[in-house]
């Protein structure tokens, strides 16, 4: 690791502001390993330890941190949520995306904040598959209720937006979000039965008129067992392999098909954000059987990710000539066409100039609707 410098002090201030309740040695360990994750881009404990002078001592220190029972995973998740609330902008929509990520028998439920075409995990829970058996929807609703309620209390219901995939299409979630007054667009399964104009029909039996790609179905009653009045649309979309598929989207607002697709199309940023955590920050390389230790390591990765996005917000999204010049320095080192995300660009830049961490501050307001400028 690099010696103590102003960049370390900035990160230390950020961790202190985020975890004021943690002991000093806990905050120092979190700071050191968050910085190691950013430097080494790995979640492998051995590789992280190699970045320190004494590898054996660093390995033991990381193990103590990840197995420290006083650092409860739920407290770390709460700290991540509170830090995100501090960094939310004062204006504009605040979009939340829900997603599960699975590694063997370990399941991670993540509530992410959409930032441009990417997302930052702001709240999470990790579970063993055996614990989730028969309780998955109930546990998910409890986590979502806590995260979404706190965000809406901060920004107001009019600014909130929630998107989720088919696994979250549940009457209990629809009821909660509608009762909270927050707008949502959730993809539902094609086998779902919906009552339109008094006639119950399964969505996959409906057809598009002519060669159109959008069809608003209007307001219908979702789920015959516990009817929910929702606006439903269907749209043709290509998947990652270029094959045509159909999105059946349910919303509690009278969105047109185009509006519903545009809103839901931001949700893949959540998947992209998880890929950033897994590959750019190396969480995919983590190998831990104990679910609480795995959750604590994800907390370190989530902190590292929000640090990177905060720096990118201050340095790359400023919208001036200097920001474009700095971004061009990253692009100039790549061959041919390349698509840079906010995270990959900032990570590449930090590798070139580690002292950029001097610009970190715990109160940086995230620019949720901004994306990288196009440079050549």
Regions found by a protein language model. Name each.
Residues 1-42, 76-78, 92, 105, ...:
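Single, function-defining residue in the core of a domain
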Residues 22, 28-67:
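A structured, charge-rich N-terminal accessory region that forms the first stable segment of a protein
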Residues 52, 69, 264-267:
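Alpha-helix boundary/capping residues
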Residues 59-123, 128:
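Active-site-proximal, Lys/Arg-enriched surface segment
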